[in-house]
Amino acid sequence: MWRMILVMTVAALGIGGWYAAANYSLEVHRSADGQFQYVRIVPRMPSGSVPSEGAADQPPAAPARPSIRLATFDLDGLDDNRLGNPKVCDSLVRILSRFDVVALQHIRAGNRGLLMRLKDQINATGRCFDFVTCPTLDRDQVEIYNAMLFDATTLEVDHSTVHSVDAPPGTFHVRPLVAEFRVRGPPPSEAFTFMLVNVLVDPRRAPQELDSLADVFRAAGHSGHGEDDIIMLGDFEADLDHFGRLGRVPWLVAAVNGVPTTTRGTRLADNILFDRRATVEYTGRSGVLDMIRELDLTPQEALDVSEHLPVWAEFSSYENGQASHVN
């Protein structure tokens, strides 16, 4: 009898250990100088994605609004040292909290700790922001990743869709990050749903990566999820006239044209792209946030935040919402 109980106990422990290893992982958090801080158990997600902090505790939806604002912001290698600068941190909180979802590029950190601290700083103002991310670096040992930061009261993410683009090694230095969202507030059957493809083009290989992004955009529309509103946004390191094959995708339009998106005002590098036939939810309103003017920063203070400016575009909260003319 005791032998049977012992066997059953060992078997249960073995099955439990296998289940834990298959469904959870240990996330080691370290300080900026590499010192151990703590270990956190996090659930594994499909395609290596990392769940957002509030996935199991969604806040109440905000009242329905006519539109939402999407943005992209290249953080220019944001690390712990820069986030530790009170002026930089305050500026980021003021910028990011203006939007419903922001595609962030070029975060430089060994784990998600930096992104968690940034989210916590925003939420300390009374907001309910969350994020999703997953491994996107294709090569090298430097930890660079992209993420989607969003207001959890106005948007919800389908965690099963969060993944980095599967491409042959060497296609991208930082593989595009993909996630699908739905607006909260309107009835689910009427709410705008969309797929974001967050990109960071390597300036040393811009022509090749831009050509490959044409394939990514086309493939996203045939991913099997049935989503036709594909929005590709990020740092393209080029304007629409120099997009190569990506610029020749039929009906592809850019939210901003002829406007610098760098803090020094020298070039257009960042943008938001979509198919104007499919994404009729675009309201026609978009722009580039001038950090110096909007936040009353000096040129150097703005450069301390990033070499890039946030680019934004507005979309209807409702599926097939009224569209404005796109030039």
Predicted segment positions?
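Divalent cation-coordinating acidic motifs and surrounding scaffolds
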Residues: 2-327
